[in-house]
Amino acid sequence: MSAKNSKDRTETFYARTGKRIFDLVLSIPSLIILSPVYLLSAILIKLDTPGPILFSQDRVGQNGKPFRLYKFRTMVKDAAKIGPPVTTADDPRITKTGRLLRKFKVDEMLQVMNIVKGDISVIGPRPEVKKYIDIFAEEYKDILKIKPGMTDYALIAFRNEEDILSRFQNVEEGYIKEVMPEKIKLYRQYLSEMSLRTDIKIFFQTIWEILVK
């Protein structure tokens, strides 16, 4: 992707204004529609293991600005203190309820709140933790020009990321050396194709991957 093409896409009317309208049109009704799912998830988490219902983590947003990303807690309390930020399918820190929520990406659905707040978009490169972005600082210069998103090409391609990481003896090393470079390629692909048509396509592809396949 050329620098010129990237610049053109990030400075279009859709990138500057249209995406925010698209985000609000989808996210505000979603908060109402998903409220029963949120309530049921909260009850199951509370009944399953001790600890908070929600999990939040610092991620890097547009132009490098940090923000708090929200999810339903799917791991044991203080899981971040006893393991790496990335997880595998057989990670013992994942709770019974957590496995169910992760299977259908229900834990991620709470990020609709981040969309309404303006931290992220519906569609865009997935928000990453700073330690990994620092490793790929040069590659992320263009990627951080736009808001991260709830879903994108990379989320679809790595739908079973935890299973992929299970193959590596050193999970974090596998994520950095094998998974991250491929994700960055897909982030750049999105950056070069960003448009309303592309966002609608990715939105429905995500629904197909999670609910149908």
Protein language model annotation of sequence segments:
Residues K4-A79, Y190-K213:
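A hydrophobic, helix-centered structural microdomain
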Residues K7-R9, F13-Y14, K145-K213:
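C-terminal terminal-structure detector
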Residues R9, L31, P85-T88, L144:
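Residue-level "hotspot" positions that anchor or transmit function at local structural transition points
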Residues S27, F55, T95-R99, K131, ...:
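Positions in alpha-helical segments
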Residues S41, P84, I123-P125, K130-K131, ...:
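Short, hydrophobic secondary-structure boundary micro-motifs
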Residues F55-R93, A154-P181, K185:
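Short, glycine-rich, amphipathic interfacial segments at transmembrane boundaries or analogous
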Residues T88-A154, K201-F203:
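A short, structured surface patch at a secondary-structure boundary
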